[in-house]
From Swiss-Prot:
Cofactor(s), names only, from the UniProt record: a divalent metal cation
Keywords: Cytoplasm, Hydrolase, Metal-binding, Nucleotide-binding
Record-listed E.C. numbers: 3.1.3.5
Known catalytic reactions: a ribonucleoside 5'-phosphate + H2O = a ribonucleoside + phosphate
Protein name in UniProt: 5'-nucleotidase SurE
Entry function: Nucleotidase that shows phosphatase activity on nucleoside 5'-monophosphates.
Residues that bind a divalent metal cation: D12, D13, S43, N98
Native source organism of the sequence: Sulfurovum sp. (strain NBC37-1)
Main location: cytoplasm
An example Gene Ontology molecular-function term: metal ion binding
Cofactor binding annotation: Binds 1 divalent metal cation per subunit.
Principal EC category: hydrolase
Subcellular location: Cytoplasm
Length: 264
């Protein structure tokens, strides 16, 4: 009799996030699910690893832990080195369901994507999944996570029944359009798009007159680009975007030009 698959789950919205709980519910029929998630929201923490303070696992329920003040990367790193230290490693790591998009340059900030990145660094298949929303989350309140759940079930089943579609040190970045499941046109392989973030920070003053800042993001502007369909274009057209992301950020096409420039 074959052993049940081992699935490790995390996120960057915190252990109480409805997106995380929806993901866990979808994955339970597919294998044994272990959850290790941050205690609080860690959005935009990137691939941050905590090196200056101690971290502690807190058991919330069976096979469900919060990592006290840890980042998503901490969650994966410590899970693989401690919780799974004497056992078979997870068959897959899934990060999400993030509340909000992680498209284009978002992934350089994203704790959700970075958890999948840490998984593939450790030699384990990784998927980051994010639910795009509209109108301050109204689309999630209306449609829930049904499409995201259906999508991740299909992807994980396909991987478990066949193989992971990418070579080492590459992960899948999945973005779910903000539509009812019945209106989705299917999956589309994409590349990362480009966006203009702009600059925005609110200045305030405390009762002592000292200034402090809140970093905010204005309305994001997607940049139209030629070539293969981008993630934001696919989502805009009601497709589920799946982007293969590699950790090697070398601009290989520029190496020769750089050598020529150095030798001038």
């Amino acid at each position: 009799m074959s052993k049940r698959k081992q699935i490790l789950v995390t996120n960057d919205d915190g252990y109480e996030s409805e997106g995380l709980l929806a993901l866990v519910e979808a994955l339970k029929p597919l294998g044994d699910v272990t959850v290790v998630a941050p205690t609080t929201e860690k959005s935009a923490c990137g691939h941050s690893l905590t090196l200056t303070r101690p971290l502690r696992f807190v058991e919330v329920s069976e096979h469900f832990y919060k990592l006290d003040d840890g980042t998503p990367t901490d969650c994966i790193f410590l899970s693989l080195t401690k919780l799974f230290a004497n056992e078979k490693k997870p068959d897959i790591v899934i990060s999400g369901i993030n509340i909000g998009a992680n498209m284009g340059e978002d992934i350089t900030y994203s704790g959700t994507a970075s958890a999948a990145m840490e998984a593939v660094l450790q030699g384990i298949p990784g998927i980051a999944v994010s639910q795009v929303y509209m109108n301050s989350g109204a689309s999630i309140r209306e449609f829930g996570y049904e499409l995201a759940q259906q999508s991740i079930i299909k992807l994980v089943q396909k991987i478990f029944e066949g193989s992971y579609p990418l070579p080492d040190r590459k992960f899948l970045n999945v973005n779910i359009p903000p539509i009812p499941a019945a209106e989705c046109k299917g999956f589309k392989s994409t590349r990362l798009g480009n966006k203009h973030y702009g600059f925005h920070a609110e200045v305030h003053y405390n009762p002592r007159g000292l200034e402090y800042y809140w970093i905010g993001l204005p309305r994001l502007e997607w940049m139209e680009t030629a070539g293969h369909t981008t993630d934001f274009e696919a989502v805009k057209e009601d497709y589920i975007s799946i982007t293969p992301v590699q950790l090697d950020m070398t601009s290989h096409s520029d190496i020769h030009n750089l050598e020529e420039w150095l030798n001038k």
